């Protein structure tokens, strides 16, 4: 910026002070400081000249608004913001050369004419020569080319015009002058932007100017000392230098954010006001900036004017092309000062820096969770709303984020474009490859501040931290159960929906979880390399062998904190805990009965369908449950390996022994909440509870009669089948019920 003590600045300050003088009769409007172009004249401007016109015009408008001299938005401002051409149909006055308006934009200042009334204002340019500063005169007259203009310029190098009267078509410079408090910008508003009627000589001069106007390209004499870039005009150089100095003189009063350009401040302030003046005719969407509307409209038109010379890929925005080209060049101009990591895109660089600062400015109103990126917040909010906008055409599954949808789609295509150079393993996502490569290096850069545990992945650390905080922000809308991880909630929801999206391509078996499918697929491809030394049973995974060996060792490392009962497997403990919590998430659609395990629901459904898939090879009898078949088969072998220590009675199943031992101990652990009656077996409690609810879930397929207990249904079905399974060993008579056999046996002597 120039020193305010310079002759130029003194002149401009003098003009500024005239604003408050008593003799200033008319306020400055935007019409006083605008240059109009015809379509033909506009085409003569090169891109640099058009950019300069846009920048200066928008800047002038900003300053007029800031001091209260402009209220409504002129059409030319809207045109410039939207990126359209701001030429007029018929010019009211002739305009000089293309260089003419540029010089006037930067240098034009006029002497005050306070006695001219509004009626006397004219849209004509009157140039009367009066004495002023040498350099100012030279710059002003430089662009006016008409007959004899070069000679006149040479003659006036040492003599300055005494007075310059500037009309509504002349724009003053805003680069110099006193500081405007609202914008923090050096602003000068000339108070003498008035007009008067042209003289005949002036009219003749204007005609001569129009007839002899030819575009003259100005030499790029203003050079940047930092990078060597040259500009035709010093105002453009001043704006460019802000990229080196970091100067941001335009400050927002709402949030204190500063900008290097005034038009950027205007656009930013619309964030606070919510003003979106640029509306799309196709979909009605509003935008803060005109260029944003232009870019958006290409979505509807499909226009992609920016094409990559390397690969031919086209883009709707020039910035996207620039970013894309860095893929070919490998350029990464944005480097982090903290860790030295480089990025090809500024947005990625800004997001990365939040890792070091810990900044998470985007907060969810529902659960108060914060995020480093607005896109992450938007995707997260869909968890609460249930919105799933991305639908797979293959299987119909919907997703709330594009990245999740893309990853899912690779399941159908089998695409795994990211391959490890060490072991050749391929992945469908680049992030998975990056994580996998740490298994070769052993790198664990993420440490827990609570316990010091290290992790290879940041996501693993984030999940681990929830163990310390106990945070469970993801809640199921069906049953209210909460989870620490979004993925756990997604998997849990499949319990309610019965969804099994992961199907084995070999045998067609479907699974609710991808991990289960991966494990299952190993049964087709992998050998069972892990063999039990006790019984010789082989397993695909070492973890499965370790679990199996607990059968032989009797190890039960998982203990219930409620009752102290121990279990061999963690899954068994989880299922057991549901007894204490009363949780029964698996509900039958036929009768509404709920179960705490999915397998119990599957077995229960066979009551309604009548399915008995387990058949005895000895006698052909079929059973609903595999365990029932196993129990039945022991009647053929007479095997009863489980003996009671009290009475030496033997049983074919350990569960029967456990139930029998309660006769000796009197233990009745299953208590009814309604009447406090206790039972030694859970099945007895379940059947008893039906007496309170009146529920009769067991239905006869023959006569549709219902029963509260399964044993009653079994006994009833013998009426239809004629089955009499209880035979007397003495006389061979058979009975439908065991109680009837017991009564009959009393008739024989010695019983």
UniProtKB/Swiss-Prot annotation:
The gene is ZNF184. GO terms for cellular component: nucleus. Residues 191-202 have a biased composition (Polar residues). The modification Phosphoserine is found at residues 117, 122, 199. This is Zinc finger protein 184. It is found in: Nucleus. Residues 191-212 are annotated as: Disordered. Keywords: DNA-binding, Isopeptide bond, Metal-binding, Nucleus, Phosphoprotein, Repeat, Transcription, Transcription regulation, Ubl conjugation, Zinc, Zinc-finger. A zinc finger (C2H2-type) spans 222-244, 250-272, 278-300, 306-328, 334-356, 362-384, 390-412, 418-440, 446-468, 474-496, 502-524, 530-552, 558-580, 586-608, 614-636, 642-664, 670-692, 698-720, 726-748. One of its GO terms (molecular function) is DNA-binding transcription factor activity, RNA polymerase II-specific. InterPro entries: KRAB, KRAB_dom_sf, Zinc_finger, Znf_C2H2_sf, Znf_C2H2_type. There is a cross-link at residue 206 (Glycyl lysine isopeptide (Lys-Gly) (interchain with G-Cter in SUMO2)). Residues 28-99 form the KRAB domain. Predominant expression in testis. Belongs to the krueppel C2H2-type zinc-finger protein family. It holds the Pfam family KRAB. May be involved in transcriptional regulation. One of its GO terms (biological process) is regulation of transcription by RNA polymerase II.
